[in-house]
Amino acid sequence: MTLEQTISAIRPLDEKSMTAARNRFANIAMPLGGLGLLQDAIVQLAGILGQPVPDISRRAAVVFCADNGVVAEGVTQCGQEVTATVAENMGRGESTVCLMAKQLGMDVFPVDIGVARPIKSEKVLQFSVRRGTANFAHEPAMTRKEALEAVEIGIKMAEMCAEKGYSLLIGGEMGIGNTTTSAAVMAALTGTEAAVVTGRGAGLSTAGLERKIAVIEAALALHRPDPNDSIDVLHKVGGLDIAGLCGLYLGAAAQRIPVVLDGVISCAAALLAVRLCPQSVHFMVAAHRSDEPASILLLDALGKRPFLTAGMHLGEGTGAAAGVALLDLALAPYREMVSFADIGMEAYQPQK
């Protein structure tokens, strides 16, 4: 589907299934609200899937790999050649998210949506829009047409996952320089100062961080992206990986597949998606708060409370994978626990 068709296909959650899930929680033999945010997430999953007892056993990670021309400004500790190396590791099932996914029975689909050099792996899906973005310090990151194309590739990935029968998705990314692009996107969408939303990424020095902030400030002043137009923001200061994730989240909502969000880059893409279609936020589950400074601001903008605050900032979808593990743990008692009636005990009642 096109972006417009996808947005028009997104419908509200199933209130009947959510009510049934809340009633089940009220009757199984545990304290009211005992599973906290995980309990809320299970109710949300019920509404997305239309299942009072949600089945998320078929799960996949879609990881978008892309390079960013702004790396030329010295905003990263390592060179962009690392993107291709890690993408090829994903093709071999050897990256961090692949090894975590293996423990969760989760399939991983790495996608080359814009790596600077061709990827030497048949296991990496080839959907390259261009060989890395332009340096947004001097020119727009990509054309508006390329931004839209990348979003629609993400939609296509969600449709592929629906056809394969997956009932839960996580989105990941790999791209040197993408904490710079995500900070620029966050600043553009919310008007927050670059210094507030920009972090050290993969270990920048203080001098490097100051340079990174200055580059983002200058790019925003140069391009003036429209905060009310997600495609314009992507076109001017975004990344192809972020665009792909944005499309994945919209496509998953249209297919009624829940998505577990990862860290700051994932949440920047999620905010772009929500600006395009506010209803899509209801299909997103927040896994963790990243160690990047923009993370809590993005989660607040999305109205999300994450399960985990573990200081993670690895990317690839690893924080989302950790969130899936917690969902599995919470679903076990939800599915199998006896009710208060079964054990002859009066159910807990809400107290004023």
Regions found by a protein language model. Name each.
Residues 2-352:
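N-terminal loops that bind phosphate or other acidic moieties
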